[in-house]
Amino acid sequence: MPETFLKFFMALQISFSKPQRRHFGVYMMGSIVCQEKHTLRALSEAVIESGAACNLYRFVAISPWSMSDLEKRRWQLVLDTLPEYPEGTYCFLIIDDSICAKTGKKMEAAGWFKGDDGKKHEFGHDVVTSHCVIGEQEFPVGLKPYFKEVWCQETKTRFYTRNELAAQLIREFKPPEGVKVIVLFDAWYLNPTVIKAVKERKFNWISRAKSNRVFHEGQEKENLSTLAKKLDRQNLPKVQVSGSSYLVYSCNLSLNTLGNTRVLVTFDAEKPDKRPVFLATDMIKLSARQVLEFYTVRWRIETFYRDVKQLLGFSDYQMRKARAQKRHWQLVLTAYTLLRLQQFTEAGSLTESPQTLGEQCRSLRQHNNEELIRLICQQSSQGKSPESICRSLRLAA
């Protein structure tokens, strides 16, 4: 491993046995340098002198170690590495879920879930995660799999809704000292269960709202869609955020089950006839521009899901057991975190970013290949035959 990556790897201080620590290291490096589908065999073959794939299976499915301990130590490593922030620095905690599409019908806890488009259903697993963003820095925080109620009943496991899992992630979040936390989520999570958790932690929130969300005006009830139809779009003020222009109407409304809330009705300035997007927040004094700027940060969790799936094999697992699946997700989040920590540290500052995650993976892959060449040359100089070298390094002859 490169020195900076190894430094953070050792700083995790997980209470592993010596064999477990070795398998943990293989899983981390394999997740990063593997160019194929991230099966256990592919992870094992991607790392020099890693041993057999069955060792990785025993590590992820059978070996006794704590997932919660790994998650806590991973986040504590992030907190220990981050700089001290000025009082009131904004810290965004993003809540969302993502589906890991699968084809194996015998995988534990797999089921049909509604896709991101809200129409198409996908078979697989659904995970709810929290993601922390401070300026240019971002790290995954927590992960909780959502299991269907039927499966929970069959396995005598306690069932939690996605909203309850999101509330747990919010309650468990340990932010850096002195920051002001704003929780960002989409319309699915705009409900009393999640909002209660936000209020308990004395955080603030910004969310997208559904068009049928009801608000009270005096004794009358109306929904946001009806409000939008009454607006004169051509005379709304234009707000520019991140290179895009919006026509925005903002006001304070009493939303059903939420109380007094700042609401934004936003139209695409280039295509004002398109359906509006509704945003809501408990920070009633924020300007429309601030609300829009803050909510655009939520997109960072979408790019996070893309990166961990495309680069680190987050959804490539083939293990049938739910325990192994949950451990795989935690291990991938740890690999992502180590990459992020290496990325900022090698920049010489935690506010700069020298490489993309894809470039980091390619760089570590090159380092792995250079180490392989070094070992081949070393064994060749000792007089070993090509066949012997291939056997010892588990290479195709």
Q: Residue spans of the language-model regions?
A:
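Short secondary-structure transition/capping motifs
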Residues: 32, 45, 62-67, 115, ...
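Active-site-proximal, Lys/Arg-enriched surface segment
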Residues: 62-141, 147-149, 245-251
